[in-house]
């Protein structure tokens, strides 16, 4: 892929969840027309990227299958690329196969809430293909993350996590990485 996000200023990422069970919008954008309208509104309001999520990571919620996630995300991605060809699209997924399918359909960025921990194929895929990547700090899974407490120097713990994961990506010569501290997740 070898695409690089050129963000000369702080960027705004508009969130478009296409799940029936999202903790932030409760399935308001499951309909393709509603999703496109919301995308248009976010772009008009200054969003630099549209982040499509098809798998809710709400605690104590069943995780969608890979097939369900693809069925939710791919049609919306294709429609956005058709209606707003200049829009930059990010895909919120922790699955390598979903990331790969979406990049093949034109997504420019992957936003991974697991920081590469849930799918061992994610970081190698991202690194080998130099795909812009949001690396989020995460402890546990959506079911268990709120059971953990970080003892000691929280800043150091988070920095060490980022360093480990970035080292993997950088071993492939990949440096287009955005760090997300995972507030509320990690």
Where are these regions (language model features)?
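Glycine-rich anion/phosphate-binding loops
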Residues: 24-43, 68-72, 115-120, 155-163
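Alpha-helix-loop-beta-strand connector modules within alpha/beta enzyme cores
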Residues: 62-91, 97-100, 127-138
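N-terminal amphipathic alpha-helix/helix-capping segment at the start of soluble metabolic enzymes
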Residues: 1-20, 170
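Glycine-rich, proline-tolerant flexible connector loops at the mouths of alpha/beta enzymes
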Residues: 22-24, 48-75, 183-186
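Conserved anion-binding
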Residues: 20-22, 57-60, 99, 105, ...
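Short, well-ordered coil/turn segments that N-cap beta-strands
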Residues: 8-12, 47-48, 85-87, 106-108, ...
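Conserved, mostly hydrophobic/aromatic
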Residues: 16, 42, 46, 92, ...
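Glycine-rich beta-to-alpha transition loops that act as phosphate-gripper elements at the mouths
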Residues: 16-17, 89-97, 113-116, 182
């Amino acid at each position: 892929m070898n695409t690089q996000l050129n963000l000369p200023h702080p960027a705004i990422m508009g969130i478009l969840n296409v799940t029936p069970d999202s903790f932030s919008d409760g399935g308001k954008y499951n309909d393709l027309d509603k999703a496109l309208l919301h995308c248009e509104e976010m772009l008009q309001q200054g969003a630099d990227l549209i982040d499509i999520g098809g798998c809710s990571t709400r605690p104590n919620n069943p995780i969608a299958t890979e097939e369900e996630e693809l069925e939710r995300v791919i049609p919306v991605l294709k429609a956005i690329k058709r209606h707003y060809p200049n829009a930059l699209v990010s895909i919120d997924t922790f699955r390598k196969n979903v990331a790969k399918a979406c990049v093949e359909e034109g997504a420019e960025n992957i936003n991974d809430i697991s920081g590469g921990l849930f799918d061992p194929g994610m970081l190698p895929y991202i690194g080998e293909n130099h795909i812009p990547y949001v690396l989020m700090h995460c402890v546990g899974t959506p079911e268990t993350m709120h059971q953990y407490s970080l003892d000691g120097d929280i800043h150091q713990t988070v920095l060490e996590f980022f360093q480990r994961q970035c080292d993997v990506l950088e071993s492939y010569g990949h440096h287009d990485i955005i760090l997300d501290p995972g507030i509320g997740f990690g």
